[in-house]
Amino acid sequence: MMFRDQVGVLAGWFKGWNECEQTVALLSLLKRVSQTQARFLQLCLEHSLADCAELHVLEREANSPGIINQWQQESKDKVISLLLTHLPLLKPGNLDAKVEYMKLLPKILAHSIEHNQHIEESRQLLSYALIHPATSLEDRSALAMWLNHLEDRTSTSFGGQNRGRSDSVDYGQTHYYHQRQNSDDKLNGWQNSRDSGICINASNWQDKSMGCENGHVPLYSSSSVPTTINTIGTSTSTILSGQAHHSPLKRSVSLTPPMNVPNQPLGHGWMSHEDLRARGPQCLPSDHAPLSPQSSVASSGSGGSEHLEDQTTARNTFQEEGSGMKDVPAWLKSLRLHKYAALFSQMTYEEMMALTECQLEAQNVTKGARHKIVISIQKLKERQNLLKSLERDIIEGGSLRIPLQELHQMILTPIKAYSSPSTTPEARRREPQAPRQPSLMGPESQSPDCKDGAAATGATATPSAGASGGLQPHQLSSCDGELAVAPLPEGDLPGQFTRVMGKVCTQLLVSRPDEENISSYLQLIDKCLIHEAFTETQKKRLLSWKQQVQKLFRSFPRKTLLDISGYRQQRNRGFGQSNSLPTAGSVGGGMGRRNPRQYQIPSRNVPSARLGLLGTSGFVSSNQRNTTATPTIMKQGRQNLWFANPGGSNSMPSRTHSSVQRTRSLPVHTSPQNMLMFQQPEFQLPVTEPDINNRLESLCLSMTEHALGDGVDRTSTI
């Protein structure tokens, strides 16, 4: 995974957290940077906030003891909101203001525990206070006691949830205690005594609450956040474990489905304080309608509810090898439907593809979500037809930007490995013998008025159920034997995808080089190589294409191309951006069909020995090249890169230097008989024939396709 992709994943997690979680995570990451990095970040932040007048006003209020003292006359809801916005702005060393905060915090926490309100907001306040450099060791020790009170109160209120939550708190504290022993020397030395106070305090108050309610420390950790955030070298690990519960209304942060892990992080992104005040009693979990957005396990992202405890033995197809469901959580998240991940986690791929609105209605899915899910599944069913359409567009010379963008989007959708129909009867005979959890979409879960429609849908979905045989990595799909000829069976999405990738490779090899398309294509192949739906044979073929495109890219005469004014005018972006995907502007600009005459063939694609097959009359002599390769003629349509540098080292290759080595899949025809065979009248055109380059491209295209379809075990091409 490239750095750009890693940053994107991290940004996705970050957006799913609330402001407090974001602050804790950033603080834990900053502990790992050097002094120079920390100072640079400080300068950047100070520069960006210099003109923020509103922040300056809040900061003055946050450090004014008189203003803070007046908050005691306000309602508890308003005080909580004020504390959340002002406490982080308290300056270290302002003892008077800190004393006022320490007077308010116990009152707010006591009110929250007594009335079982604002539990989440109270946890956030505790988080800020426990990691704030302005609070002393004694302050943190006193505040840490409230965390246990919050836990006890919530455990009593929520009944069966106390086991998982108390375990998770103990786990976070114990894990932090041991982690701290080895992390003091890894903080790069720029933390001061204020920060070290956090760590000392955390160790002290952890000892007071080290006893586990169940008599042991659980051995699992959060599955929704990166490991580094749960094993940080500061007290933020404890804060995360303390915050990680009682939030059944928040969205799931993780791209993976909720698991039986009580130590899950909060998931509500960019909460406003109005939202914090408005939530109140709604945070209580519901025993009904588990799929509604207000109470679903998936939407909360929390593993501490009784729903997950009841499903400890339930199947989770997201984790089953060859199920085709591993990408469903990410797919649902892209559709903003990830709150229903728990529903899909107990379906097979075939059951998901056969879903109807009636079945979803029986599971209490809202009307808008039902409609969106059904439409999205219908789009999944149309993927193979879309691939066929893309294949035709590529063959006809269409722009590669749009197909590559479509392929990038498609590879992120759920794709299951194709199983031939011959294995389906055996799989079906074995299926009743295997123990299986009842499906959520079974007849018993459907409403009476929907059973007939579901039965009809199931009948129509029977052919697609042939893929239930599981992943067969060594099975050969039809496209591997005859890439460009044999039709693929219905449902062979990986095979169809591979075929389109072959067509794209052909176009990249024979068309004018486009670094953006090449980079996008290589990234796409990397995703295919780690995808479970593709067979080993398909992956070998994809790897071969990747190597060829990489070789083509490495042999790219960059200096020569950068010296061509016409090429620079057509490409507004320079080289060195090979890791970038097509941008919105570039994709929008390439919507029209590509004119083959505008994309000439560079010298590396066809060696000079093969060019000789066309006869000397089809090309310009060296003297003619010297007189015709002028910018004016290039702008008039003769922009063939062969004529870009007359007389130079990158000019049209001679017979003594071939830019492409000979391979066994495409022999070089140098005998007189073969030369006569290729010297047909249609190729013996005058030099002034305007479509000579178009004919050359067609010839190279056919030669490359012949090489790509060389055979089952012969993965080499030109």
Curated annotation (Swiss-Prot):
In the record, which positions carry Omega-N-methylarginine? R573
List-wise, which residues carry Phosphothreonine?
T424
Question: Locations of Low complexity compositional bias?
Answer: 453-466
Span list, region Disordered: 278-323, 416-474, 572-601
Gene Ontology molecular function: any one: mRNA binding
* Residues the record lists as Phosphoserine modifications: S168, S420, S580
Q: Which InterPro entries match?
A: PHAT_dom_sf, SAM, SAM/pointed_sf, SMAUG/VTS1_RNA-bind, Smaug_SAM
Q: Which terms are listed as keywords in the entry?
A: Cell projection, Cytoplasm, Methylation, Phosphoprotein, Repressor, Synapse, Synaptosome, Translation regulation
Looking at the UniProt entry, the stretches that span the membrane are none
**Ranges of residues in domain SAM:** 323-391
Task: Classify the source by domain of life.
Answer: Eukaryota
Q: Name one GO cellular component term.
A: cell junction
The family database entries (Gene3D superfamilies) matched by this protein are listed as: Smaug, PHAT domain (1.25.40.170), Transcription Factor, Ets-1 (1.10.150.50)
**SMART domains the record matches:** SAM
Could you tell me where this protein is found in the cell? Cytoplasm; Cell projection, Dendrite; Synapse, Synaptosome
UniProt record, GO biological process: nuclear-transcribed mRNA poly(A) tail shortening; positive regulation of translation
Q: What does this protein do?
A: Acts as a translational repressor of SRE-containing messengers.
What family does this chain come from, according to its entry? Answer: Belongs to the SMAUG family.
Would you tell me the protein name for this molecule?
Answer: Protein Smaug homolog 1
Q: Which organism is it from?
A: Homo sapiens (Human)
Its taxonomic placement starts with: Eukaryota, Metazoa, Chordata, Craniata, Vertebrata
